[in-house]
Amino acid sequence: MRELLLEIWTSVRRNKLRTFLTGFSVAWGIFMLVILLGSGNGLQNGVLANFNDYATNSIDLYGGRTSVPWMGYEKGRRIRMRNSDLEILEREFPEVEEVSANKWLDGKKATYGHEFTQVWLRGSLPKVQQMEGIKLSAGRYINDADVKNYRKVIVIDEPMRRILFKGADPLGRQIKVGGLVFTVVGVMQGDAQRNSSSCTIPLTTGQLIYSANDPEVNNVILTLRGIDTDEQMEDFEKRLIRRLSAEH
């Protein structure tokens, strides 16, 4: 054993650079492993935190694309969900407790006075607030009267308040989004230091002025009741797909 240790020590002394590089590589590998494990846990916790406030009995529906040709239509046709689908879900499925929807209206330029920022705009129905667990730091969310009367009201987020209003009270102020004037009625909670901003207007208003009154929605949110087993959920999914497929 003594001779073996002496041989190792002699080899180390003769190859100092190689020894250093080997040790550094091992240390760097351990360091990166710790960083990746920490990042992975942080990402997981962040994702879970984002969904903590979502209704636990909710599901999201997206149109997607067709997988096979049908009735003269080619494979890969985009399925465009519409306002009428919400009525079908409410009327024909007793398991559906609440229905809501969003329409993404892409990036727009928002301005107030000499200040401006790029924002992600969406049109939503009032129940989205409860289903997605949206919290407000000021004012209110979109309501039924806004939707019914196509009101030009908007709910902004904290980054928008910071950039456009320098942290001042924005309620009742008018801003331009995509060249059109909206009145601020609420502010959503969130990290004010984020660079990206998002804002919400009534679904009907967005469909009317940005989509030529096209009734398409990008996703439908459902909250369910009376489904307690995997078998019940599977049966509901089959009936849901079969019924909506008949419409599209």
Where are these regions (language model features)?
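Hydrophobic, regular-secondary-structure patches
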Residues: N41-W120, K127, I163, L208, ...
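Short aromatic/hydrophobic contact patches that present stacked aromatics
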Residues: A27, L36, N219-T223
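Amphipathic alpha-helical segments that mediate coupling or scaffolding at interfaces
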Residues: I8-S11, G46, N50, G178, ...
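N-terminal Sec/SRP start-transfer signal
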Residues: M1-F31
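Mid-to-C-terminal secondary-structure elements
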Residues: K127-I142, D146, R151-H248
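Hydrophobic alpha-helical segments typical of transmembrane helices
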Residues: L4, I8, T22, G46-V47, ...
